[in-house]
From Swiss-Prot:
Domain of life: Eukaryota
Source organism phylogeny: Eukaryota, Viridiplantae, Streptophyta, Embryophyta, Tracheophyta
Annotated signal sequence range: none
Biased amino acid composition, Polar residues: 1-11
Protein name, per record: Putative zinc finger CCCH domain-containing protein 10
Region annotation Disordered: where it falls in the sequence: 1-110, 183-296
Record's compositionally biased regions (Basic and acidic residues): 12-52, 86-110, 204-243, 251-284
PROSITE patterns linked: ZF_C3H1
Length: 389
């Protein structure tokens, strides 16, 4: 304890004595400068001596000597000013060093460390402002120091929150970074997935370990993984080449078809084809509407088709006759179909004797009045339906 008290007393005495020593040195220097200035003035006045009678004697030396003296005096004055400034700067630097050493000595304390039980480590001052809403000071985050000090506008978190960050890049946790490539932090989220840069080349990566030997590492640029992609690309190229060849072969055909379509013969043929297709469609529709086609129409159909295939059908008269014949055939087919339907209808014919027996068995007696009347079969059937059914 006695040793510790002695050290603190000695430090306080040094603090009190240092400013006084510096002040004494500055006074001595100022006294020397004043003495040198007085000597210079006396030398300058010695060139011009005034007698008691008021007469000015001749100037000693020539004009060249006077000019040289003036230059020397100016140079001496400039050198004195420079030396004075340098002395002030050195004094201020020495004063600042003394103050910083005293501060470090006062702020230093014993910090416990598990590896080195007690270590004498300096603790930095908390002069930097903490602004949680602002961005972190980049220089402070890297070096734990800031040039602006308390005037800095950025955030300076305490040292406990940023351990082991000196000289290392941190992960940018702000999401989408606004600084872009100028940001000194890492961006692991943006590099995940497809945004990772693909390795170039197909050779395996060779890296050196601590012993100096090279070893293979797992890389995505092996040729085995890219054979499929290359094959797909080649197939795509082959399909494109085939399509181009087909187009080149098809172009002359298209040109020939266009030339033929402009000719009158080709137009007439196309018109006849369209006319045939329309007639065939109409005949099919009529056949489905009328039911079964008669045998006569089947007999006439080959002749009808033969007439259509003839080149003389281009005339209007032949076409009109064919249309009339077609209409007649349709009418005949309809008449025959109706007759067949009438024959297929069920007709009920009852004999009078049988009807009377049935009516007596059922208990009807009013029908005897109708027996004498001349009723037709239709009326008799209607009366039976009303009373019996």
């Amino acid at each position: 304890m006695a040793n510790v008290s002695f050290t603190f007393d000695s430090q306080e005495q040094n603090k009190e004595l240092r400013p006084s020593r510096l002040v004494g040195r500055s006074d001595e220097r100022n006294g020397r400068r004043q003495g040198t200035e007085q000597k210079k003035k006396e030398k300058e006045d010695s060139g011009f001596r005034v007698s008691e009678e008021g007469e000015i004697p001749l100037q000693q030396g020539s004009n060249t000597d006077s000019y040289a003296r003036d230059d020397l005096t100016q140079q001496q004055r400039v050198s004195d000013v420079v030396m004075q400034r340098r002395s002030h700067e050195t004094e201020s630097r020495l004063w600042q060093r003394a103050r910083t050493q005293d501060r470090r000595g006062s702020e230093s304390r014993m910090m416990f460390d598990g590896r080195t039980q007690w270590s004498h480590a300096p603790v930095l001052s908390s002069a930097y402002p903490v602004r949680p809403g602002e961005d972190n000071c980049l220089f402070y985050m890297k070096n734990h120091l800031c040039e602006w000090g308390s005037e800095c506008c950025y955030n300076h978190p305490p040292l406990q929150e940023i351990p082991c960050r000196i000289g290392k890049k941190l992960d940018c946790k702000a999401g989408a970074c606004k600084r872009g490539s100028n940001c000194p932090f890492n961006h692991p989220k943006e590099r995940d997935g497809d945004s990772l840069p693909m390795p170039q080349g197909r050779t395996p990566d060779l890296r050196r370990n601590d012993s100096g030997r090279r070893y293979n590492t797992e890389s995505r640029s092996w040729p085995e993984n890219k054979e499929k992609e290359v094959g797909q690309f080649r197939d795509h190229q082959d399909s494109k080449e085939d399509a181009q060849e087909v187009l080149l072969q098809q172009r002359p055909r298209d040109v020939e078809m266009r030339k033929r379509s402009r000719s009158p013969d080709f137009r007439a043929k196309t018109e006849t084809k369209e006319h045939r297709e329309a007639e065939e469609r109409s005949s099919r529709e009529s056949a489905t509407a009328t039911g079964k086609v008669s045998g006569k129409e089947n007999e006439l159909r080959p002749t009808y088709v033969y007439l259509l295939m003839m080149p003389e059908n281009h005339n209007v008269d032949v076409q009109q006759t064919l249309q009339e014949q077609r209409k007649r055939n349709i009418k005949k087919a309809r008449i025959e179909a109706r007759l067949k339907l009438d024959q297929i209808r069920p007709t009920v014919v009852l004999e009078n004797s049988r009807a009377t027996k049935m009516m007596i068995e059922w208990g009807f007696t009013d029908f005897r009045k109708l027996q004498g009347s001349n009723l037709g079969n239709k009326k008799w059937i209607c009366w039976v339906r009303k009373h019996c059914c």
